[in-house]
């Protein structure tokens, strides 16, 4: 997978979202789940006033289809109030990947997919809950995109939203293989 000189991922479908500002330095890759149905439904939501500026650079559907919404040199509203390795407000210095996944909403997961649910406790605390599983095709696509981004932009870390905003976010959650993704990108262990 290659990234073009104008910061687009070759081979990805494009659905341009307006907005954002120039991002001169990219330091981190942040992985999220959409808390929703399909990748397209999330993109459609981001186009509404109710989204309040929420967006991400990449959305990956359960079948592994990759959609890019903004070039990687433009900010997106994916991190919100966040902090990591001395940086605050990570929208200004991170690339966001959203994975179509219901997270810990088992009713939504059962309505949109027949994927298994994992019963687990989140690493940041809370009760044992049911989490939607991530399909192999989606994990593989995420890994390919992440490796290309880390290589192209020499990113400092790959983290979950749950790592940069632990008191308010729980994505991508315990069913996502974060350690495997990080190791594929050249980082050791968990964030």
Residue ranges and their predicted role:
Residues 171:
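Aromatic-lined carbohydrate-binding surfaces of glycoside hydrolases
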Residues 30, 159, 177-180:
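Intrinsically disordered, low-complexity regions enriched for glutamine and histidine
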Residues 2, 6, 21, 59, ...:
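Acidic, His- and aromatic-enriched active-site or binding-groove loops in soluble protein domains
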Residues 153-168:
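Acidic/histidine-rich, metal-coordinating catalytic segments
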Residues 100, 164, 177:
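Short, electropositive, low-hydrophobicity segments enriched in small/polar residues
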Residues 2-156:
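Active-site-adjacent loop/helix surface patches within enzyme catalytic domains
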